[in-house]
């Protein structure tokens, strides 16, 4: 491998297999690359498949700055309720829903678009009192997590499968923290028949697309060939404005000093930006602050994450 393992830095676009937890995938890649510093962005349920962004090396510090938008292909089964809000759990209620039509369902989907209040599943990775909710639930301690506001940008109907327990296939584009299992449950409740998630594929996450993802077997093969397909930070963070520093400025900034910058337009306060050196090398993430009230174009670039 051309990259030194000790200085490896970047992201991998993993197609998570079904039956694996997100942590299982991280552990596998740690063993594969023989490094400890590996993390992931956006937990996927074990039964789900699709895009799982993997951060390698110091790129783990950049995970909070990746784009939040996610896209899913979800299949919802109606007439069935489970304790996990998917088919992996215990069935709590089951009944015929063969009277439902797409014409009945379509208008209800609008209630799930925009800023919506959502209660996460009782079986989830949310922490409460230092414990994951799924850990408590497995011990019989079912805790209803507090509701929270999430953003759903779009819901498109992909297919409809009528029957005793009809299934609805949707494309859902949303922000971080949105539980598709909760949408399945709540849609079923609105229809009065119950609902649960039958299948979930994440097609986009943190700017990475399923069409360009690689399986664990693909990654293992490419790693052995010395061709690990790392996505460099500049590309993964292309949604952020880039600010270039001169060599003296870069040295000071990397030592933790703020740098005064003059912009033709005022940048938003606290905006995160990519910071690069004059040769284009990625230095880290900075934050914009305004200090000169008389000239709001004069701002400072505060070190947020320094990688150089």
Curated annotation (Swiss-Prot):
GO biological process, one term: mRNA pseudouridine synthesis
Active site, per annotation: 45
EC number, UniProt record: 5.4.99.25
Protein known as: tRNA pseudouridine synthase B
Cited function: Responsible for synthesis of pseudouridine from uracil-55 in the psi GC loop of transfer RNAs.
Matching PANTHER family: PSEUDOURIDYLATE SYNTHASE TRUB1, TRNA-PSEUDOURIDINE SYNTHASE
Protein keywords: Isomerase, tRNA processing
Organism field: Gloeothece citriformis (strain PCC 7424) (Cyanothece sp. (strain PCC 7424))
